[in-house]
Amino acid sequence: MKIRKLDVPNYPILSVDLSDEHVKLLFKYIKKANESVHPTMGNQWIHTLEFSGDAVTNRKPTFTNDLMELVDENDEFFNDVIRPVITQYCVMSDLAVEHLVQGDKKPLMQRFWARINTPDEYAPAHYHNGVFSFAAWIQVPTNNEVEQQQDPESSDFVLHYSNIIGLPEKLNVKMHDGAENTMLFFPSRMMHEVHASRTNHNLYRVCVSGDII
């Protein structure tokens, strides 16, 4: 008797290791945004973050919104990183990516932003109105192995989906040293959330995200 497993076609979630060059590029964009007048917050946004090298060391009280809009100069990050990932996604997906796309459009980055959070801050479950989304962690101060002895999901990034019989499932991405300088790439309509951490409340997690249409 021979038993074989049949894998059900689905859309993949990709994990990407970012090069040092591209991590530095993202920090450069954050530093430039830190020197710019915010369209709604005004001058109080300028120099609201403090750095040591490429690490965020302080977030001033004037940082009243944890979402910092970024500018991808000459589409450098999109062309060097996102476009090749889209190509690989189309190759690796079990299902036709065309079903995710509305009309015959060339991909472009609709939104591009950074979140600078203390790990005790959280983001409730939500989805984005794009085709693909990504989350790139370039500064991760947490250590899951220690804090998850009390809370097994503490500081996790969680993706929600339904299995083949329609029951809810989730994929937990652990925030530890190995998560730094990695990027997740997934369909925008996937629900996802960020759990709060119980420790490291005076340190900062830096995540750069974007939506592709």
Tell where the protein language model's regions lie, with residue ranges.
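Catalytic core of non-heme Fe(II) oxygenases with the double-stranded beta-helix
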Residues: 108-185, 195, 207
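Ligand-binding loop in jelly-roll beta-barrel domains
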Residues: 191-207
